[in-house]
């Protein structure tokens, strides 16, 4: 930690009157630079990083998730990375439980937690809380899966739209797991998933003094360029070999949450002979762009975000140092 930031750290960490413990939420679209800023905050402030990423929880999925490298993790450890095998499920409720425990652990050490990632549903559930919607029923799930094999997931998505249009509007017609879960909840309870979510509880928004920062480019075209460049870099780094190792295990399939992760689904189809290499690349980039679009939709409705742009008003790229200084300056204002 730089000595010049010690005073800032002391102000951020020290209790002051009725002020709640500080927690930093660092969000943004994919490929925007969240990891770099999180590592910088660790170096500058001694903050502890908690990953908020539904794909990085899986072991042996490193390149395609843009997981921090071994050297980066040695420099700035990330919690909630590599905690599940790709064959295992990891729910939103699992994340909320684990993240709450990590935040408490970090505060007990007198440090500041930085929750960094792009899985917006995780952030929303952690801050606003989870509802007590019914647990999964294997028999009901099996019935839905049987119908899907006969009718196709788009048909079941249309059915979901007829009973719960709000939930269906936020789910892609081919996102089997989410369609299945939403229909399952409706069949079991007779109540829409959107109605259950309206009864959320146990959120942390009022438990901590949240500093909520979004790092993003001013222009979407820059993000699209970075997405394409990063996907090509992943391919050069051996992404296909990484997915091939998962494919050859024979205990994973394309309907599992791990393999549905952006990029992995497209590479899986390539290895299965469903698409060509060029088609895989195009679809992988397109899927990542769609992910960024969905993330921006969440972010635009997020109240209380401090936007830190990676470009100036003339669309020129800012240096890493300039971006970090923007974040530190905003944090300093919060202590006044």
Curated annotation (Swiss-Prot):
Cofactor: Mg(2+)
Amino-acid biosynthesis is among the record's keywords: no
Keywords assigned by UniProt, alphabetized: ATP-binding, Magnesium, Nucleotide-binding, Transferase, tRNA processing
Substrates-to-products reaction catalysed: adenosine(37) in tRNA + dimethylallyl diphosphate = N(6)-dimethylallyladenosine(37) in tRNA + diphosphate
The protein's role, per its UniProt record: Catalyzes the transfer of a dimethylallyl group onto the adenine at position 37 in tRNAs that read codons beginning with uridine, leading to the formation of N6-(dimethylallyl)adenosine (i(6)A).
Entry keyword Cytoplasm: no
Interaction with substrate tRNA: annotated segments: 53-56
Tree of life domain: Bacteria
Subunit structure: Monomer.
Entry similarity comment: Belongs to the IPP transferase family.
Site residues by UniProt (Interaction with substrate tRNA): 119, 141
Molecular function terms from GO: ATP binding; tRNA dimethylallyltransferase activity
EC identifiers of the protein: 2.5.1.75
Gene that encodes it: miaA
Top-level EC class as recorded in UniProt: transferase
Binding site for substrate: 30-35
Protein name listed in UniProt: tRNA dimethylallyltransferase
GO terms classed as biological process: tRNA modification
InterPro entries in UniProt: Dimethylallyltransferase, IPT, P-loop_NTPase
């Amino acid at each position: 930690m730089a000595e010049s930031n010690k005073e800032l750290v002391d102000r951020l960490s020290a209790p002051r009157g009725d002020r709640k413990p500080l927690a930093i939420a660092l969000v943004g679209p994919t490929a925007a630079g969240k990891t770099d800023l999180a590592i910088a905050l660790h170096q500058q402030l001694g903050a502890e990083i908690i990953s908020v990423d539904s794909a990085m929880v899986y072991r042996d999925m490193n390149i395609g998730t843009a997981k921090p490298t071994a050297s980066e993790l040695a420099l700035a450890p990330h919690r909630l990375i590599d905690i599940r095998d790709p064959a295992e499920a990891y729910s939103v409720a699992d994340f909320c439980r684990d993240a709450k425990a990590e935040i408490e652990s970090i505060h007990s050490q007198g440090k500041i937690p930085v929750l960094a990632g792009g899985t917006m549903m995780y952030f929303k559930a952690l801050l606003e809380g989870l509802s007590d919607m019914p647990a999964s029923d294997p028999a009901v799930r099996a019935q839905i899966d049987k119908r899907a094999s006969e009718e196709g997931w788009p048909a079941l998505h249309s059915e979901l739209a007829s009973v719960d249009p709000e939930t269906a509007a936020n789910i892609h017609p081919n996102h089997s797991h989410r369609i299945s879960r939403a229909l399952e909840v409706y069949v079991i309870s007779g109540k829409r998933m959107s109605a259950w979510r309206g009864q959320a509880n146990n959120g942390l928004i009022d438990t901590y003094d949240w500093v909520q920062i979004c790092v993003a480019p001013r222009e979407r075209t820059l993000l699209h360029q970075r997405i394409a460049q990063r996907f090509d870099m992943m391919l050069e780094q051996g992404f296909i070999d990484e997915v091939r190792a998962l494919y050859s295990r024979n205990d994973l399939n394309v309907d599992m949450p791990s393999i549905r992760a952006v990029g992995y689904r497209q590479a899986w189809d390539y290895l299965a002979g469903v698409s060509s290499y060029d088609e895989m690349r195009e679809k992988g980039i397109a899927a990542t762009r769609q992910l960024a679009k969905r993330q921006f939709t969440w972010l635009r409705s997020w109240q209380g975000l401090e936007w830190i742009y990676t470009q100036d008003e003339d669309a020129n790229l800012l240096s890493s140092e300039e971006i970090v200084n923007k974040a530190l300056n905003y944090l300093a204002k919060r202590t006044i």
